[in-house]
Amino acid sequence: MLYIITPCSRPHNLQRIYQSMNFTKVDRWYIVYDTSKGRDYTFKYANHDKIIEMKHDEEGVCGHPQINRALDEIDENSDAFVYVLDDDNIIHYMFWILLPTLDSNYIYTWDQNRADKARFLKGGVIQKGRIDTAQFIVPRKYIGSIRWNPTERQADGQFIVDIHAKHHALFKYIPEIACFFNYLLAGSGA
């Protein structure tokens, strides 16, 4: 099983993200709209049986409270993989190739294709500032009560570090590029 979480304050990107999805392999795509600061959004996929749209008005940075809201919706004992996909990114084709090979008794990281001068970020280094949320997939049962810090910009790295501290023996690094970084912001230059 696969649950994808997208915190959303850029709904204009959702159609492009949708096009990168393989819904035969997705059980649920949680789109959590950031309605803090008086913002409001119209649901786009109300009739899609695999998409759950919700609004969450807790203030924070980078959609972190919205990610936490979706995590709270998923049974904490579930073997389902959780993957966070930011609303400025799409799913890399290699992700769909790797997904069926993953075992829900493990946590996985992989490499990332970036459009900047660094170009590639290796997923084998579990340190804040050295790993991005798109490089990481985890069964919900290993997240437990760990959550993203709502006000910290690099909360994704800290979230991964916290899970690694608790379950380091379960981490497996796949030396393949299986994700992008800010693909939609980079003008698809990745």
Regions found by a protein language model. Give the residues of each.
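Active-site donor/metal-binding and catalytic loop motifs
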Residues: 115, 134-135, 174-190
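Active-site-proximal specificity loops/subdomain of glycosyltransferases
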Residues: 37-78
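Conserved catalytic core of nucleotide-sugar-dependent glycosyltransferases
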Residues: 92-161
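Short beta-strand-to-loop acidic/aromatic patch adjacent to the donor-nucleotide binding site
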Residues: 79-90
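Conserved short acidic donor-positioning loop in nucleotide-sugar-dependent glycosyltransferases
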Residues: 21, 33-37, 87
